Regions:
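Interfacial helix-loop-helix linkers and transmembrane-helix boundary segments
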Residues: 43-52, 70-72, 98, 118-133, ...
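Transmembrane helical segments that form the transport core of multi-pass membrane transport proteins
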Residues: 244-331
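Alpha-helical membrane segments and immediately flanking helix-loop junctions
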Residues: 100, 104, 112-118, 133-143, ...
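Membrane-embedded hairpin module used as a gating/binding unit in multi-pass transport
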Residues: 196-272
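Intrinsically disordered, low-complexity non-transmembrane regions of multi-pass membrane transporters
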Residues: 1-23, 29, 75-87, 91, ...
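Hydrophobic transmembrane alpha-helices of secondary-active transporters
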Residues: 61, 99-125, 264-267, 285-307
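Entry/N-cap segments of selected transmembrane alpha helices
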Residues: 123-145, 303-328, 379-383
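Flexible hinge motifs at transmembrane-helix junctions and intramembrane kinks/re-entrant loops
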Residues: 39-53, 57, 66-69, 154, ...
Length: 402
């Protein structure tokens, strides 16, 4: 009987329940609650469920004491040396294997490949001026970098230059880009930045409208834009090739993201590789999304997530996103003035690369002011330009700080 009781005691002492009673054990319980809350947002509120659901579940798995699903000490530093590869293969958990795709920068470009197969660049080709709106929305990234450096200079929080650059990319409202940049510059902040980036992407319909209305007049919001011209198939095919060459020559570090985005789009527009285009946009993208979200979620352990840095990242991320939206709208106002009122400034807010949510918000706000107005296709131009812009901004940040 005594041996049986000792066995039960031993089982309990080696269980995760016992570890909750250890110093700091309550932090893991808090993180599990945070993961459950994110699951609620994904399932009930449908906030970015494709990403948030596996990410939140990964967060829960990583904070179950003793699960051993990931060992972040393997990934400290800029690269993986040969002995560490062997250590991961022999003793690593499931998330260690999956996280190698993040560490090596494999998943985000493949996500961009899938995005390219679903993206229509015709509105941008039809109205090249909308590229300026997509570029203007990236000012939020660089403005937030300066804000993070200011916080560091005043001693409020000790963000390094690389960490500041990684945080600022949240302003692009592009989850894969944020993960790609952070994994290169500040992998220790990956979980916090990924959660913030995807949360703000889901909150686009909440965050953007007040900013759009505050910066525009009713007259500007009711502007009806001319119908876009038809774009030939030849131009649709030439565009991704031309963009890849030009952008890669100007910003080589952006080549991998822009190149994969344009490869996916070329598959779509060429019309000769339907089978692999559908695979890239459906099966492959779905698989990579699961791997990416789960492995990133597993990096959000209590000791790296529950600190003051996370709070500042969330605040700076909101500032970055708001600045990007405001910059796009202000650029739209300039174009409104220069064209004699032919451009509706509301489409400028779609310059952030949350596709197609930001464009839908422009459409919704515009239609609330003028029910006969249809801005969706006009807003898609800046929206897809924002995807290119965020990839270019990522390349610039990696080039400077990588």
């Amino acid at each position: 009987m005594t041996q049986f009781i000792d066995t039960l005691v031993g089982i309990f002492q080696s269980s995760g329940f016992a570890r909750f009673g250890e110093p700091g054990g309550y932090l893991y319980a808090i993180m599990i609650c945070v993961g459950c809350f994110l699951l609620y947002l994904a399932i009930v509120k449908e906030f970015e469920p494709l990403i948030l659901l596996p990410m939140a579940f990964g967060m829960i798995l990583a904070n179950l004491p003793g699960s051993g699903i990931i060992h972040m000490q393997y990934f400290v530093g800029d690269g993986l040396e040969h002995p560490m590869w062997i250590e991961i293969l022999n003793n690593g958990g499931l998330a260690d294997m999956l996280y190698m795709g993040v560490k090596l920068g494999i998943y985000p470009p493949l996500i961009f490949l899938g995005i390219g197969t679903m993206t229509d660049f015709a509105p941008l080709i039809s109205n090249p001026k909308s590229l300026l709106l997509g570029a203007a929305a990236q000012f939020g990234i660089f403005g937030t970098y300066m804000g993070a450096r200011l916080l560091a200079a005043t001693g409020i929080v000790d963000f390094t230059q690389k960490q500041s650059a990684a945080i600022s990319i949240i302003g692009g409202a592009d989850g894969p880009t944020a993960i790609f940049v952070t994994s290169r510059l500040a992998p220790e902040l990956l979980g916090s930045i990924a959660v913030a980036a995807y949360s703000y992407m889901a909150l686009v319909p909440v965050i953007q409208p007040p900013i759009m209305k505050a910066l525009t007049t009713k007259k500007e919001r009711t502007v009806v834009m001319k119908q876009l011209r038809t774009v030939s198939k030849t131009k649709r095919i030439i565009f991704p090739i031309m963009v890849t060459i030009i952008v890669s020559l100007i910003v080589p570090d952006a080549a991998v993201l822009v190149g994969m985005l344009m490869l996916g789009n070329l598959m779509k527009e060429s019309g000769v590789v339907d089978r692999i285009q559908k695979t890239a946009g459906n099966e492959l993208m779905n698989i990579i999304t699961i791997f990416l979200a789960l492995s990133v979620g597993c990096t959000t352990s209590a000791n790296t997530f529950l600190n003051s840095r996370t709070l500042f990242i969330i605040v700076l991320g909101l500032i970055a996103f708001s600045f990007g939206t405001a910059a796009g709208v202000l650029c739209g106002k300039v174009m409104y003035a220069l064209t004699g009122g032919q451009v509706n400034p509301l489409i400028g807010s779609a310059g952030v690369s949350a596709v197609p949510m930001a464009a839908r918000v422009s459409q919704k706000v515009g239609q609330s002011e003028n029910p006969s107005n249809f801005l969706l296709m006009h807003a898609m131009g800046p929206n897809v330009a924002g995807v290119i812009g965020s990839a270019v901004a990522a390349g610039i940040l990696i080039n400077i700080f990588g």
